[in-house]
Amino acid sequence: MPEHHQYQFEFMGLLFNGTTMITTTIAMAIVVIITVIGCRKLAMRPTGLQNFIEWVVDFCRGIIKANMDWKVGGRFIVLAYALLFYVFVANMMGIPFELVTKEGHNVFWKSPTSDPVLTLTMAVFIVVLTHIYGIMVTGPSTYGKSWFTPKWFLFPFKVIEEGSNALTLGMRLFGNIYAKEILMLLLVSLGTTAVYWGIFAFVPLIVWQAFSIFIGSLQAYIFAMLAMVYMSHKVEQH
């Protein structure tokens, strides 16, 4: 299998992953464009893209209602929608093809969620956001007391729990998507080795691409669901 490297560049002494930045920007643009077009001409009887957008919003509403009261959780509908839709699009981006330069074997196209830096950054952002809303919704006093209930000596374990939540949330998404792309790259490399290997690799590649769609969809759901679970722990008094 040929060795491929992700495109990187240095700016002000810092090393940036250009591949992740490119694909992340494209994924965000896809989400924004589809949402804007779908909501541009709203109708009482939705059709086409508006129908799809409303279905995604209803699905996100179901995720929120499953974890917290709607009066509290209704404010997170946009967050849930953005997380679910973006992670889904990002997961799907590596399925059709991989764009590689011939000279340096630099990968310019992949699922951005196969980069642990991105997934862990998103996970940390979610965990930090839960604490911000925890203070805003329950108040500083109630939020502060929650760290020492039911017993004060559990405080260190709660700190560890917050760190593990961010770590597992990010690494779960990264691990599944990275494994998906590695196996797909192996099948493609096998298929291009020789004609007879291409015949044997074609069917498994098609099957794996279909299964990759399922994996990407499932991981997008899990990421959005866990984000709302963590949010409910902070904004609702248990």
UniProtKB/Swiss-Prot annotation:
Cellular localisation: Cell membrane
Pfam families linked to this entry: ATP-synt_A
Assigned keywords, A-Z: ATP synthesis, Cell membrane, CF(0), Hydrogen ion transport, Ion transport, Membrane, Transmembrane, Transmembrane helix, Transport
TM spans (from-to): 18-38, 76-96, 117-137, 173-193, 208-230
Membrane topology qualifier: Multi-pass membrane protein
Oligomeric and partner information: F-type ATPases have 2 components, CF(1) - the catalytic core - and CF(0) - the membrane proton channel. CF(1) has five subunits: alpha(3), beta(3), gamma(1), delta(1), epsilon(1). CF(0) has three main subunits: a(1), b(2) and c(9-12). The alpha and beta chains form an alternating ring which encloses part of the gamma chain. CF(1) is attached to CF(0) by a central stalk formed by the gamma and epsilon chains, while a peripheral stalk is formed by the delta and b chains.
NCBIfam families: ATP_synt_6_or_A, PRK05815.1-4
Function: Key component of the proton channel; it plays a direct role in the translocation of protons across the membrane.
Protein name: ATP synthase subunit a
Native species: Shouchella clausii (strain KSM-K16) (Alkalihalobacillus clausii)
